[in-house]
Amino acid sequence: MPLVIADRVLETTTTTGNGTVTLAGAETGYQSFSVIGNGNTTYYTIAVNGGTDWEVGIGTYTSSGTTLSRDVVLDSSNSGALVSFGSGTKQVFVTYPADKAVYLDASGVPSGNIATTGKAVITALVFGL
């Protein structure tokens, strides 16, 4: 199951507790989690509108039942553990967690945590030679 990231993916849920969330459909102007693909993983955020409960993690999308499992919590309002969400509507969206990000700094140099598995080709700029 590959890790898939897509732009403008936002759904809502009324699921309570700390288990798998049932997705209620895309918000107007956004894509649904179906673009992630059945059985694929993605980075997600669950947040209560106007509230203090939130969670960022890695989850697996399942098209039958349109659910997102909460497999790994990367950060949360519950000291990095699963959040037990109460009643009400929560937003669920695809995100790109800061601690997983690799980006170019203001000088165009790659920054962030860079790790590879298997074969990798790295091209670098060398300054001061």
Where are these regions (language model features)?
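Generic short beta-strand segments
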Residues: I46, R70-V73
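Glycine-rich, low-complexity segments
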Residues: M1-Y30, G65, V73-L129
